[in-house]
Amino acid sequence: MKIEKAKQLTARKFKRMSGVSRQTFNYMVDVVKADEKKKKKPGRRPKLIIEDQVLMVIQYWREYRTYYHIGLDWGLSESAVCRTVYKIENILISSRKFSLPGKKELLKMPSQENLVVMDVTESPIERPKKSQKKFFSGKAGEHTLKTQLVIHQKTSQIICLGHGKGRIHDFRLFKTSGVKFSELLKVIADKGYQGITKIHKLSETPIKKPKGKKLAKEQKEYNRELNRLRIVVEHVNRRLKIFNILSNQYRNRHRRFGLRSNLIAGIYNYELALKA
């Protein structure tokens, strides 16, 4: 669907089709146009106007069809679609308009009122030809790429992401990601982060049930309260995985996955700020 037809859609249908609001889409177009104006030699005129290029890239993330099928809809070759996707992604990333606050922001949160939630989500990938064991996730039962999310509990803002191969344990991914918290910042994580209190004292994880025993009523209440606070991260995961490129089997080169997930997370934060 080209931009002329997309303009005829209602705001609700446009977001359902693309995964972003019309206001966010227009801002992305403005960012790309500003970058294009900087070029002294624009070169050959592209077949698609900038609005169509951005819409095509968003649809690629949203539907995650092959370049071939996307090209059939837009009247482009596979290579032209690939070049356009890479170009628009690189412009949006380099503009820093959709950058995440980053790990340093966690050290600037001294108050216990700033509660953060940490969790890991997985995206399936095609079975690798080499090093299959490194990507196989026992929890998911398939080959995956892991993404660690650190989220502000009250605002639902994504602060930073970390990435790893499917086999790596959630807690080990945390240690290798370089994420550090200020001493007074309270952190909530799931059972995969058992032992985090040794690194950060103000961390809380659910109480694991002892082998052959049951949890006491107070322990169950404690776990229930933690789950109530950390449910926000599940809602954020759902919002991100509206884009099939993060939820369906990832077919592209793995080194591009981190860039794309950070960009989509930044777009999510931008939309969140619009609602505030």
UniProtKB/Swiss-Prot annotation:
Record-stated family: Belongs to the transposase 11 family.
Binding site for a divalent metal cation: D119, D170, D190, E234
Keyword Membrane: no
Keywords: DNA recombination, DNA-binding, Metal-binding, Transposable element, Transposition
Organism name: Microchaete diplosiphon
Cofactor(s) the protein needs: a divalent metal cation
Short name of one Pfam family: DDE_Tnp_4
GO biological process: DNA recombination; transposition
The name this protein goes by in its record: Probable transposase for insertion sequence element IS702
Residue ranges of every copy of the DDE Tnp4 domain listed in the record: 118-256
InterPro entries: HARBI1_dom, Transpos_IS5, Transposase_HTH_dom
Known role: Involved in the transposition of the insertion sequence.
GO MF terms, alphabetically ordered: DNA binding; metal ion binding
PANTHER family: THAP DOMAIN PROTEIN
